[in-house]
From Swiss-Prot:
This is Small ribosomal subunit protein bS20. GO terms for molecular function: small ribosomal subunit rRNA binding; structural constituent of ribosome. Binds directly to 16S ribosomal RNA. GO terms for cellular component: cytosol; small ribosomal subunit. InterPro entries: Ribosomal_bS20 (IPR002583), Ribosomal_bS20_sf (IPR036510). The gene is rpsT. The keyword Ribosomal protein applies. Residues 1-21 are annotated as: Disordered. One of its GO terms (biological process) is translation. It holds the Pfam family Ribosomal_S20p. Belongs to the bacterial ribosomal protein bS20 family. Keywords: Ribonucleoprotein, Ribosomal protein, RNA-binding, rRNA-binding.
Length: 90
């Protein structure tokens, strides 16, 4: 265990940040799952609405430093591709 005062503070900060990041990452996974479920159900309006929410949240998490910009772009692109595949299938 850390002995210096600054090292103890760093341990506390790391725990706090890890917990916060875990919360947002879990939330992001659930939002992505909502989009995939809406696409699977075939409800185009619900899929588009879920995509809007996901897009907003994912970019919000970039500004919070939870994920990196390219990671977010990749996730959003994948979701857009998925929702757009509904248009082609219909």
């Amino acid at each position: 265990m850390a002995n210096h005062k600054s090292a103890l503070k760093r341990v506390r900060q790391t725990k706090k940040r890890t917990e916060r990041n875990r919360f947002y990452r879990t939330r992001m996974k659930n939002i992505i799952k909502d989009v995939k479920e809406a696409v699977a159900s075939g409800n185009k309006a619900a899929a588009i609405e879920a995509l809007k929410v996901a897009n907003k949240r994912i970019h919000e998490y970039v500004s919070k430093g939870i994920i990196k910009k390219n990671n977010a772009a990749r996730k959003v692109s994948k979701l857009h591709k998925l929702v757009n595949s509904m248009n082609e299938a219909a």
